[in-house]
Amino acid sequence: MKAVATVFICGSLVLITYLPLVVTSPQTLAIPEKLRQAVGRVVVNATACSVTCGLGYKEETSCEVGPDGVRRDCRSQRLECLTNWICGMLHFTIIQRQQFELNCLSSDILTKGQEAFRFTWKLARGIISTNDELFKPFRANSPFLRFKPAYESDSGTYRCDVQQLKNLKLVKRLYFGLRVLPPKLVNLNFQQSLTEDQKLAEEGWEVHLDNQSQPHLPGWRKKVSLALGVGIAAGVVGGVLVNVALCRVLGGTGGNGNLSSL
């Protein structure tokens, strides 16, 4: 048994040693003459997709390449491309009774024609979310949703799905987060919503909003403020000294007059 095992191991080693030589021999790798003369069309250049999400287009150039590596009969064509069909969410905040429109179209869809696509809308009423389990069908088959006007009950998340009619392939999904606010509930005036420190910062003052410290003037304004402070202080001190001097003079004059009368 030991002898048989030894012979088997030695035979395996010999086979492993000579197998690469057999595989790489010219006879094994011989290429037929017809295959050597074959010509194939390969893509030599392609642009990126025109959009990052949804249906887009790209330019592709292909050429015939032979055994000599020379490119012949090159052609360029415009092809559809789809990088990602989920296009995120757009947020909108409007006032009640304001006319508004949600638009699911894109330039590439307009180029091909919206009649080649199917538009389906769904709504998650009253919340802003991308959880597809919360959406219910919304009766609309147009690429637009128009609110004439919008009411608070129209708030929610609207989902637009775009499919190609030729194969019902989903090529785009876009979410719209819509908030409709009563006019008396909130004032959207930006300036009126600022705090005192924020207003000072808007006017050019150096304000540390993170630690709620007192506002600091810029360098040139600090110098002006310092000069004004020194001037005011000097004026006050000078006025006090003048008053003291006048009081002494008037006091001395009054005393001399009294002595003269005596």
From Swiss-Prot:
Regions that span the bilayer: 226-246
Location in or out of the cell: Cell membrane
Domain Ig-like: 83-171
Glycosylation sites: 45, 211
Signal peptide location: 1-30
Primary subcellular site in the record, as a coarse category: membrane
Cytoplasmic side: 247-262
GO CC terms in record: plasma membrane
GO biological process: sperm-egg recognition
InterPro entries assigned to the protein according to its UniProt record, in alphabetical order: Ig-like_dom, Ig-like_dom_sf, TMEM81
Keywords associated with the record: Cell membrane, Disulfide bond, Glycoprotein, Immunoglobulin domain, Membrane, Signal, Transmembrane, Transmembrane helix
Task performed by this protein: Essential fertilization factor required for male fertility. Part of a conserved trimeric sperm complex with the essential fertilization factors IZUMO1 and SPACA6 which bridges sperm and oocyte membranes during fertilization by binding to IZUMO1R/JUNO on the oocyte.
Name this protein carries in UniProt: Transmembrane protein 81
Annotated organism of origin: Rattus norvegicus (Rat)
